[in-house]
């Protein structure tokens, strides 16, 4: 029960990021982030991984004429490398690449992000940069990204 409450509390955390497009105005994209995935040990302290994160998402765009809000279910596949500290230290460093999609006014928007950060046990913290592309490959938005996520793993490192 305690673990479930922890997961729910972490799921309520959001990933704010700035999205800017000169035709649509300024805005931000938020979503809870809970991961599940596979980790493979290839060295004493290095583990490449692939994860899937899901959750509801919302894109808020502001301009001079109207304010647009799009809420949708968002899925992301991401992978990268973790470097673990030696001994029983619970900290690790990570480099993570995300690719995912969501809908805005019925159009799919592809989101790519590169994130660097740290992990304490199963809780990840990161910062990076993202770009979002509309269906015709035009840049829909871009900007900095802050991430907080929780990992469900099939085994512990």
PLM features: residue spans?
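Positively charged n-region of N-terminal signal peptides that target proteins for export
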Residues: 1-4, 20
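Short glycine/proline- and aromatic-enriched beta-strand/turn motifs that initiate or cap beta-hairpins
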Residues: 19-60, 147-149, 153-157
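Outer-membrane beta-barrel architecture
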Residues: 9, 41, 80-82, 115-119, ...
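Membrane-embedded beta-strand positions of outer-membrane beta-barrel proteins
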Residues: 30-32, 54-56, 79, 93-97, ...
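Residues that define the transmembrane beta-barrel architecture of outer-membrane proteins
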Residues: 26-28, 34-38, 60, 71-77, ...
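Sec-dependent N-terminal signal peptides
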Residues: 4-14
């Amino acid at each position: 029960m305690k673990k479930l409450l922890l997961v729910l509390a972490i799921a309520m955390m959001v990933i704010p990021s700035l999205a800017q497009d000169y035709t649509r105005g300024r805005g931000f994209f938020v979503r809870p982030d809970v991961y599940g995935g596979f980790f493979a040990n290839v060295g004493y302290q290095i583990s490449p991984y692939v994860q899937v994160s899901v959750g509801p998402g919302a894109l808020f765009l502001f301009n001079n004429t109207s304010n647009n809000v799009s809420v949708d279910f968002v899925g992301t596949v991401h992978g990268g490398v973790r470097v673990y500290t030696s001994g029983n230290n619970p900290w690790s460093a990570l480099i993570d690449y995300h690719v995912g999609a969501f809908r805005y006014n019925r159009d799919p928007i592809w989101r790519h992000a590169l994130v660097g950060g740290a992990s304490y046990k199963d809780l990840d913290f990161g910062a990076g940069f993202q770009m979002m592309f509309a269906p015709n490959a035009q840049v829909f938005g871009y900007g900095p990204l802050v991430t907080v996520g929780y990992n469900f793993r099939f085994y512990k490192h």
